[in-house]
Amino acid sequence: MATSQVLHILPKPSYEHAFNSQRTEFVTTTATNQVELYEQDGNGWKHARTFSDHDKIVTCVDWAPKSNRIVTCSQDRNAYVYEKRPDGTWKQTLVLLRLNRAATFVRWSPNEDKFAVGSGARVISVCYFEQENDWWVSKHLKRPLRSTILSLDWHPNNVLLAAGCADRKAYVLSAYVRDVDAKPEASVWGSRLPFNTVCAEYPSGGWVHAVGFSPSGNALAYAGHDSSVTIAYPSAPEQPPRALITVKLSQLPLRSLLWANESAIVAAGYNYSPILLQGNESGWAHTRDLDAGTSKTSFTHTGNTGEGREEEGPVSFTALRSTFRNMDLKGSSQSISSLPTVHQNMIATLRPYAGTPGNITAFTSSGTDGRVVLWTL
């Protein structure tokens, strides 16, 4: 059974978060032009720094664990790369994405020598560093994208890129850069992979909010706005997939997913509770909610002032129903401490926390309730 621990309560909603490799610092976006950095302080967390170089709302952030670099993207159509100096200060570098619409999503590649930025301009900017000119260069993936890119994920080979889009499609494209990447080995996705090769295109019943390659890279999972998760097992280039399995959920849509191992996927979204899906090429199923909302939890939140505040929950469904009935009939309400789940609102992002890519043992979640929660599988 999964256990949870509230690491920190942010003063604002969190739409994206990322930890450093030591898990001693994390950054978060809060629907402003700022990125907030928090660092561990004893048993709690304290605000350490604010990055405010963007002019408009920061839409996504990612932290490269090996190189310790942070990348951000924004509605101002640009990206920034932050590198930590030996004296503890951060050097920021502007990356021109050459977009005419907002940047929506960003992820470092596994080797951390490239990053990809989705956008509302129907293109993906693949950025890499040119040593000769000392700047970041962007190349555009365009074909066959027809709408806003909502999510991205890199294949373990550092070349293939999965994209979830608002045109109700999930794509697998080649982001091979000749001066950066070694020639990739042949796989089920193809052997000849020049830049912008379309390796696969899969349908969905709604916007594709999340995509993710399996640890082996031989399967792709994606979550649609129709409350479904689809797992695709490709067979060969330009051939129908060996299996295309769709799991229909009886809950609100998912926003984020990650592979715990080759046969388990953790996903979360508008339903406030992470869920576990398990299966293989023969079939997948939603096996359980990781937050059943049946046990009482308590935690202490330490803010910047150092004052602790203990909160307890949850309350029963009967109490919630009674409260809303009284508000409707009598115009009165009674105090309710919390909902029956650890998260009190939408879960926006899931991130691996402990384990290896093929065996994730713990992950973190953040959402619009401002909570950053650690889950142990």
Swiss-Prot record:
InterPro entries, per the entry: ARPC1, WD40/YVTN_repeat-like_dom_sf, WD40_repeat_dom_sf, WD40_rpt
Q: Which GO terms describe its biological process?
A: actin cortical patch assembly; actin filament branching; Arp2/3 complex-mediated actin nucleation; cortical actin cytoskeleton organization; endocytosis
Q: What is its main location?
A: cytoplasm
Entry's localization field:
Cytoplasm, Cytoskeleton, Actin patch
User: One Pfam annotation, family name?
Assistant: WD40
Q: Name one GO cellular component term.
A: cytosol
Cleavable signal peptide: none
Tell me which Gene3D superfamilies the record gives: YVTN repeat-like/Quinoprotein amine dehydrogenase (2.130.10.10)
MF terms per GO, please?
actin filament binding
Q: Which UniProt keywords are present, listed alphabetically?
A: Actin-binding, Cytoplasm, Cytoskeleton, Repeat, WD repeat
Role according to the record = Functions as a component of the Arp2/3 complex which is involved in regulation of actin polymerization and together with an activating nucleation-promoting factor (NPF) mediates the formation of branched actin networks.
Could you describe the subunit structure of this protein? Component of the Arp2/3 complex composed of arp2, act2, arc1/p41-ARC, arc2/p34-ARC, arc3/p21-ARC, arc4/p20-ARC and arc5/p16-ARC.
UniProt protein name: Actin-related protein 2/3 complex subunit 1
> Which organism encodes this protein?
Schizosaccharomyces pombe (strain 972 / ATCC 24843) (Fission yeast)
